[in-house]
Amino acid sequence: RIDQDDRIALLGQNGEGKSTLAKLISDRLRPMAGRVVRSSKLRIGYFAQHQVDELHIDETPLDHIRRLRPSKTPAQLRAILGGFGIGAEQTETLVGRLSGGQKARLSLLLATLDAPHMLILDEPTNHLDIESREGLVEALTAYSGAVILISHDMHLLSLVADRLWLVKDGKVTPYEEDLETYRKDLLSTEK
């Protein structure tokens, strides 16, 4: 069960199914067996690092958001972009010329534009500089919906997550220890 104010970190080694679970929860992947139960009114925002590669490189950030909000004025669209750290200069820059961090901010903006009840973030700090990571932490802390995080960034997880779930051997179980214990467990299994 996931409640609206949950901040859940999915833990597990590479290949254990964290991203697959995130895709199942967000309805980006159909289950091979069983079912996923969710409210028909539930809106889920999903951000994965590969989405940065799905942006239209021959368009500007303003073009991307204008397509989704055609009734908004250019000033309103620029204000939305500015709220995600995409400044006036970048709004008219082709996405192909933006930095990795700027592309990641645009992708995150697009994932949250419809005010989802839940955000699922799969490796959200890849491509982000330190300032952008701090901004992400602030945004996630202020966000009123549920958050599910997959990240190797233990610092991010320690600042955002209040529940830990371990994905291992095809099962998801609450992880009752803290992140430092998990990190030590990981290091001991790698030896």
Which stretches of residues belong to each language-model region?
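ABC ATP-binding cassette signature C-motif
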Residues: 1-191
